[in-house]
């Protein structure tokens, strides 16, 4: 299989987030175009990941669907691959995101479009973490995932959302520096 399927499942949510960004905001804050695009993107990505899970050879314990691209003068390689454990985490991520989108439609009262963008971008980074075979790329995806999580907690969180967002960001950032 020559098609870069792991890159596709990683960046499809990011493309969906771009389309959600391009939708026109409506005055009633229930941007149905953004909702439909988010649901469509996340469900399509889930079914593609189901296909990958079905296609993986479960008798092989080595990495499969390996993609490798030189990135920074051969020092850092953009290398993706999955094994039996990582595909389960990717599948779980792709299963949870549509549920989050459906549940947030009525519970998020302000800036629903921005929330959906943050959720799709977060899906991209989480899947990137589970597909990465290069330590630098893994670290970049992991750290980049802090940004949408910080926004989700800080804008749409509970009563002490700003305090919680900064604590989450600092503890996770400082903890990952040791990696």
Please describe what each predicted stretch is.
Residues 1-7, 19-102, 106-117:
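Transmembrane helix-loop-helix hairpins at membrane boundaries of multipass inner-membrane proteins
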Residues 9, 79-80, 130, 139:
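Residue-level signal for helical boundary/lining positions with a hydrophobic bias
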Residues 9-13, 38-41, 93, 119, ...:
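Residue-level recognition of transmembrane alpha-helices
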Residues 15-17, 97-98, 119-126:
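Hydrophobic, membrane-inserted alpha-helices
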Residues 18, 88-89, 139, 148:
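Hydrophobic positions within alpha-helical membrane elements
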Residues 26-34, 125-179:
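Alpha-helical multi-pass transmembrane bundles of energy-transducing inner-membrane proteins
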């Amino acid at each position: 299989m020559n098609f870069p399927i792991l890159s596709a499942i990683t960046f499809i949510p990011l493309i969906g987030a771009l389309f959600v960004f391009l939708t026109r905001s409506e005055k009633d804050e229930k941007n149905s175009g953004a909702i439909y695009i988010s649901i469509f993107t996340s469900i399509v990505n889930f079914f593609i990941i189901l296909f990958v899970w079905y296609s993986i050879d479960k008798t092989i314990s080595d990495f499969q669907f390996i993609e490798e691209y030189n990135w920074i003068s051969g020092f850092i390689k953009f290398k993706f691959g999955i094994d039996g454990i990582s595909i389960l985490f990717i599948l779980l991520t792709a299963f949870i995101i549509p549920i989050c989108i459906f549940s947030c439609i009525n519970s998020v009262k302000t800036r629903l479009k921005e929330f959906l963008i943050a959720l799709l971008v977060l899906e991209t980074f989480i899947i990137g973490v589970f597909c990465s075979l290069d330590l630098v790329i893994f670290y970049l995806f992991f750290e980049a995932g802090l940004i949408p999580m910080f926004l989700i907690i800080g804008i749409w969180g509970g009563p002490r959302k700003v305090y919680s967002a900064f604590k989450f960001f600092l503890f996770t950032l400082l903890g990952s520096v040791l990696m």
